[in-house]
Amino acid sequence: METYSLWLKNENKPIIKKKILSYKKNSKTVLVKTLYSGISKGTERLVASGNISKDQFDIMKSPFQEGSFSFPIKYGYINVGKIVEGPKKYLNKNTFCLYPHQSLFKIDINNVNILKGNGDIRKYLLTANMETAINIFWDTQAKLNNKILIIGMGSVGILTAYYYKLLKFKNVFITDINIKKKKFANILGLKFINFKKIKNLD
């Protein structure tokens, strides 16, 4: 069977590669068909432009990366798909995997997150960002009465602020130099503060 993957041949030079993929049914691996593949705007922009320094190559490596940051490289880690081959109990299950941009791939079942629930599964493209938000929460070790300011309303910033809100933190503020993003804070019930007034937060 054929599979197609996105590679960066050189700086900002993406290409599509075709490959013949073989799969023999077994109890340990499954075949996943990609439904949605997300691009990390920050990380993958750095990778595509060749701006990963050599001392960061090992740290920045994604789990199923092929090639190197010196190019060519197949990179990515936000994949929402469906199991199309494998043990019967997993068939047709929706999945999230830390896999690059590829139409069809085989993977060890231990590296697959089975998605539960109904609704629009595109929301699971934010899974990697949500993990980062939770790690931020753990690393800060904040107390409920602490005053917290989150700078930047990208996906990670918004998810981090919202996670604090879910955990009943009352003094959480978020800001961004783009004042138009205030409307998103309002929708989520987050406390937006004008970037120019940060000094007055205390």
Each predicted region: which residue ranges?
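Short amphipathic alpha-helix with an adjacent loop that forms part of the alpha/beta core around
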Residues: 196-202
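A structural motif shared across PLP-dependent enzymes of the aminotransferase-like
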Residues: 96-111
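Residue-level recognition of beta-strand termini and adjacent short loop/turns
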Residues: 9-12, 26
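Short loop/helix-cap segments at secondary-structure boundaries that form the rim of catalytic
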Residues: 90-91, 105-109, 182-187
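Glycine/charged-rich beta-loop-alpha catalytic/anionic-binding loops adjacent to active sites
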Residues: 110-121
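Mid-domain Rossmann-like dinucleotide-binding core that forms the NAD(H)/NADP(H) cofactor-binding site
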Residues: 119-195
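Extreme N-terminal starter segment of soluble prokaryotic enzymes
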Residues: 1-5
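Glycine-rich beta-strand-centered segment in the early N-terminal region that forms part
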Residues: 23-39, 47-100
